[in-house]
Amino acid sequence: MATTSEINNDLSFSVVSIVEDVLQQHSSRSSDVGLVSRKVEESSLRRYEAAGWLRDMIGVSNGKDFPGEPSEEEFRLGLRSGIVLCNVLNKVNPGSVSKVVEAPDDVADGAALSAFQYFENIRNFLVAIEEMGLPSFEASDMEKGGKSIRIVNCILALKSYSEWKLKGENGPWRYGSNMKHNFGSRKLFLRKSSEPFVSSISRTQSTDMLSTDQPLSSDGDSRSINGLVRSFIADRKHEDIPNVVESVLNKVMEEVQQRLSIHNEMMKSSSKPIPEDDSSCETVVRSQLCDARQHEEAEENSPPQVVEKKFQRTNFEHHEEQKILLNQQKHIQELKQTLYTTKAGMKLLQMKYQEDFFHLGKHLNGLAYAATGYKRVLEENRKLYNLVQDLKGNIRVYCRVRPFLPGQESGGLSAVEDIDEGTITIRVPSKYGKAGQKPFMFNKVFGPSATQEEVFSDMQPLVRSVLDGYNVCIFAYGQTGSGKTFTMTGPKELTEESLGVNYRALADLFLLSNQRKDTTSYEISVQMLEIYNEQVRDLLAQDGQTKRLEIRNNSHNGINVPEASLVPVSSTDDVIQLMDLGHMNRAVSSTAMNDRSSRSHSCVTVHVQGRDLTSGSILHGSMHLVDLAGSERVDKSEVTGDRLKEAQHINKSLSALGDVISSLSQKTSHVPYRNSKLTQLLQDSLGGSAKTLMFVHISPEPDTLGETISTLKFAERVGSVELGAARVNKDNSEVKELKEQIANLKMALVRKGNGNDVQPTAIPINRERISRRRSLETPTIRPKLPTMGNTSNNSRPQIMDLSGPEAFNDSTASSRRHSLDIHELMKSSSPAWPRQPLNGKDEDRESKSGEWIDKHEELIQNQNPNSPEQFYQSMVPQQQSLYGGKQDFEVQSITDNESDEAATSDCSDSDLLWRLSVQVNVPKVSNIQNSANPKPKKIQPRTAKLSETRSLIPSLIPAPSKRPPNTVNSQPQRPTRDGKRRLSLGT
């Protein structure tokens, strides 16, 4: 019995396990389909419930009956107009929708509605629902593809609210607690059939737990299997049940046969045969089959109408799913086509962009090459322009616009309209004439944002030319408060970025001189002067005395104020100390227009002397850095007392500067340099051979527009002045030697002419050097000398005129002159004469001097090479004929610059004697027979009153006693095209 019970337990356990496995497999396959179908069925039942309640509430509307069990499309079309919803809401809560827009009776269900009707009814319904606190939906849910489940929820909530009101509004209304859904008998059947399934599972679990202790009876096994089968097929369709039962039976039979075969083998091997008894298994299978048949019969006995409806509903849902699937596939195909088109377009765009980039690169390369060429041409043009400016001698004019000071911003308004490379445009209002924009052109224009370094870098080549032997003048001009002192010096608190032109210029000179120290040795010294109330004062005086200093133009070493302190400097620190000392001594005060107004003109003069270590030649250069005091109007500056006197002197000196510029621009014969100490100090720069730069400053404030326009007009007039090409101040050893030889010869001639029988000093003449220099020089005009064979009285030498007014235009007061009498000159020694630059004529004079020496030696050799006394005796008749009789004279060329210089400049005794040594040509002997007993005449000095001087200069050569009738020319002629001016002199 024990063995039989074990076999039964084994078989019963196996049958239950097999049934559970088969049911789990079928449940896993159909779980998804069942879940979807249950959800669809549940939503349909809710929709039917909502439609039934609406049908009960409104009945027939507009001759149309609302369907009791509509589909989603029918449900949406019935509610799309909003009339049904608004009417139901007014019945539940009267007055919720004040106005319902009715539709015509003949409008079909799917026809398009008017926009007003559609939006008015639906909007009013949704507003009222939200005010009542009920679940709402979107207006788009009424369209095709919308979420109808939200419409159903809203209607069911409204139904629950209506039922709550009908019950007397007992307690607070809650939609979740009050909502009762009646899903029909089918739902109740599902709910009832689920209970034995749960109980069967619990029983199966308890049976499994107790299987090891107690044997199971056949009745319990059959009940457990029956419960499992019933619970599984409860929610299945009719067509699925036979398949499930068949699979269960097949599986059970296979398992039973396998178990029986194993059991038979075990029985054969045992000693006691066990009778086969499979009655329990057959009983279980039969019971399950009976239950399945009963369930099928129950399903078949259900009404055919319900089955038909379910079938139609399933087909409709299947068709809807097919439509959705087809639409999705269609959208996928469209997206694929769009993606393909986009990729093709992107490839085309990529190719096009690559082509465009290639062409753009070629174009940019061409532009870059053109820009490089343009910069190169622009730089070359700038160099050529500067070269032309140097050759013409034009005064360079730079303009700088001061930025607005803190607290002076006038709402962004500025008198300056536009600033270009070399043009500045001023906005001119109507009160200054014709309103509009007026441009002014200069060499360079700096805007308010320009730095000190940018300003100096543009004038750096001009500053460096001082080391090459040129004279340079840079002066700042403008009204008071326009930033002149800031440009030239810098602010009160100096930094490396704010250093002015004065500091930067000297630092650059030190740097360049240090670079050239292997070839040239430079000595740099500084003077610092100021012109205060028309008095020249030394700002570097250690004792603090303000003694009056004299200005001497055309001095041999370029120092126009020799009495001022000349301090050698070798570094930037020395310059800063000197500048600080000068700024402390300079006159500065406060006015209504400027807190630190300069009350004087400041001039920093840098003297440079360089010596070439190879040739020994000496270069002289000077640079004037002038900070002019600003012009000011007394009514604006509000000055009185001493400040008023200072302003008057400042305006007077600036007015004199304007007169000088006007005369130079008009190229008049007389330039009034002596009208002011300022113009007298700047005479060498304005009328000489210097490179001059005027830095004009203006203010951007509209209040100073009048002064700005006048300043710019004056600067334009300055830019039109031509001074002539600048010259290098250079002395070489050959010129110095020739000057000494000519001075010794002239002194010997003068002594012999006075009857002093003095043997001349032997003068060594370096013929090789003279011939080499003559070969390098250009041909010059030689004086006409008669031949030895011509002994007639008509053969008279031509000499330069020294007695006329043109020869002594450069004159000063007699109190500052040394005596030029011949007797006093004889008593003095003959030192080496320094070279005096006389407007570019030094080279011509040197060549003429060399030629005169050649003629002089040839004359001595022809007369008597062994008797030098005879040569000096033969010069006595020449002296006699020199002062008596008819003479013709030739004057060398004098340029306009010389005449301008000579009109107002001082002339020292060394300058005059140098002119005598160069211009006077000794004539040849006209009569050798009368040279034995010479009768020298005593020289009678004659004074000539000059037109523009205050002193009388004695003439070295008296005028002839008779005036030629046809050769008198009282007025100097205008210079011809070749620059020559010839005069005939009489008494």
UniProtKB/Swiss-Prot annotation:
GO molecular function annotations of the record: ATP binding; ATP hydrolysis activity; microtubule binding; microtubule motor activity
Disordered as annotated region, ranges: 201-221, 759-849, 927-987
Keywords tagged on the record: ATP-binding, Coiled coil, Cytoplasm, Cytoskeleton, Microtubule, Motor protein, Nucleotide-binding
Biased composition (Polar residues): 788-797, 964-974
Record bears the keyword ATP-binding: yes
Coiled-coil region(s): 725-754
This protein's name: Kinesin-like protein KIN-14G
Organism this protein belongs to: Arabidopsis thaliana
Organism placement in taxonomy: Eukaryota, Viridiplantae, Streptophyta, Embryophyta, Tracheophyta
Gene: KIN14G
